[in-house]
Amino acid sequence: MAYHYLMDLALILLSTKLLGLLTQRFQMPQVVGALLAGLLLGPAGLNILTETEFLSQLSELGVVVLMFSAGMGTDVQELKNSGRAGFWVALLGVIVPLLMGTGLAWGANAVGLIESNNLLEDIFIGTILTATSVSITVETLKEMGKLETKVGNTILAAALIDDVLGLVALTLVSSLAGGGDSILLVLLKIVGFFIFAGVVGYAANRLFCWMLRCQNGWATHRNSVLAFVLCLVMAYCAEKFFGVADITGAYAAGLAVACTPKGAYIQSKYNPLGYLLLTPVFFASIGINVKFDGISGGMLVFSI
């Protein structure tokens, strides 16, 4: 049993690639195939695989590496230029699902599809629908070759800002319900994170440039290791101390590395790791975690 995880990984890697190729034939991203592989092998399907601590931690590392690589592949100047457009897209991406989700929840409750006791619960359901999956967005853009384009940067900026705005909205609703942190505390943490990310990212960027300049390229390989250390530390601090998703910290670390002369070289070291192992495990793990127990027909109709 100690080595059962090896067979689990083999099944995940094989199924995600096969179903990824299949979905690609139908003009869909391969990430859809990876999600379907998890559904098929998990409790919602054949029940061959179940979520384990090993798979959970490996999948979490997978999404961190995915966002770190996305940050390293981002044109920082283009991202700055796309910031305003990304903000308005993100703002609409929160407001529209929030209003429509709240209205649909109220209507679904009225006809008996779901049960909600008051308007606040309907608003909470609407708030949940504001969430986006930045990781799926990144993987799809990478597969399409659009991640480093103006459109890709706008979409990515919008997705990241949407995550932050969604967190603020969720905190506000939780505060109205009498639980969770205060909205002021959450806003201070978010501002604190961006200050932290800016200072640490700038310092790390200067350090990498100094090492390359002083050692005539000798430190290139070591910079790859230090870059990953930076990614892990920023991802941890984002989640632990600032209440921001770890993937946001990883992406910020990637942006810092992208500004160095060897940013593209360092990124090339992590792309194979993500493609061969970590990214497939992450997306398959999403499907494996899906369980239909306790989901009523009305809730299923509402979800669709």
Report residues per predicted region.
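Core mid-bundle transmembrane helix pairs that form the ion/substrate translocation pathway
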Residues: L9-A10, K17-L18, V164-Y265, P272-L277, ...
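N-terminal transmembrane signal-anchor/hairpin module of polytopic inner-membrane proteins
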Residues: M1-L41, G45, L49
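Entry/N-cap segments of selected transmembrane alpha helices
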Residues: H4-G20, D75-A110, D181-V200, V290-I304
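Hydrophobic transmembrane alpha-helices of secondary-active transporters
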Residues: A37-L41, S56-S82, S174-G178, I247-T260, ...
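Interfacial helix-loop-helix linkers and transmembrane-helix boundary segments
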Residues: T23-M28, I48-Q57, G73-V89, L113-S116, ...
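Structural signature of hydrophobic alpha-helical transmembrane segments
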Residues: M1-I12, E51-S69, N117-S133, L187-V199, ...
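Small-residue-rich segments of transmembrane alpha-helices in multi-pass membrane proteins
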Residues: A34-P43, V89-G103, A157-T171, A219-Y236, ...
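Short helical (or helix-break) motifs at transmembrane helix termini and adjacent helical loops
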Residues: L66, A70-T74, M100, I125-A169
